[in-house]
Swiss-Prot record:
Pathway: Carbohydrate metabolism; D-galactose 6-phosphate degradation; D-tagatose 6-phosphate from D-galactose 6-phosphate: step 1/1
Name this polypeptide is given: Galactose-6-phosphate isomerase subunit LacA 1
Family statement: Belongs to the LacAB/RpiB family.
Domain of life where this protein originates: Bacteria
GO molecular function terms listed in the Swiss-Prot or TrEMBL record: galactose-6-phosphate isomerase activity; ribose-5-phosphate isomerase activity
Xref: SUPFAM superfamilies: Ribose/Galactose isomerase RpiB/AlsB (SSF89623)
Catalytic function, reaction form: aldehydo-D-galactose 6-phosphate = keto-D-tagatose 6-phosphate
Pfam families cross-referenced by the UniProt entry: LacAB_rpiB
Lineage: Bacteria, Bacillati, Bacillota, Bacilli, Lactobacillales
GO biological process terms held by the UniProt record: D-allose catabolic process; galactose catabolic process; lactose catabolic process via tagatose-6-phosphate; pentose-phosphate shunt, non-oxidative branch
Protein's gene: lacA1
Quaternary structure, from the entry: Heteromultimeric protein consisting of LacA and LacB.
Length: 141
């Protein structure tokens, strides 16, 4: 599974920590960060790369996570979540089939970020009754 990473200048240090953690865990990483671009361009790069192939997940880091969440959810086929805790990261995979999360580096510290990422990338999609909501989300954008 490939994990697409992106960050703006405010999130780059935490993104690098996440990148190292995921590489140590054996994941293939594609880092699309352009440090000279703002969160909008970097979020679009992550979301588009995730949508290019099945089985990809994305993680975007900026200062607060809210802006990238708003950008990502504008793209057709993208279900994204802004997360700042492990349980939400895990559950958004299980119930929403989220393919991307956004994290705020000024909200989430290094150890919590690792736990969030681990929950997200290892969380299975439950399907079943949850697919109805996923289909509804996909019809919206």
């Amino acid at each position: 599974m490939a994990i697409i990473l992106g960050a703006d200048a405010h999130g780059n240090a935490l993104k690098e920590l996440i990148k190292s953690f995921l590489q140590e865990e054996g994941y293939d990483i594609i880092d699309v960060t352009d440090i000279n671009s703002d969160f909008i361009d970097n979020t679009l790069a992550v979301a588009k790369a995730v949508n290019e192939a099945e089985g990809r997940l994305g993680i975007m880091v900026d200062a607060y996570g809210a802006g990238p969440f708003m950008v990502a959810t504008k793209l057709k086929g993208m279900v994204a979540a802004e997360v700042s805790d492990e349980r939400s990261a895990y559950m958004t995979r299980g119930h929403n089939n989220a393919r991307m999360i956004t994290i705020g580096a000024e909200i989430v510290g290094p150890e919590l970020a690792k736990n969030i990422v681990k929950g997200f990338v290892t969380g299975p999609y439950d399907g079943g009754r949850h697919q109805i909501r996923v289909d509804m989300l996909n019809k919206m954008a």
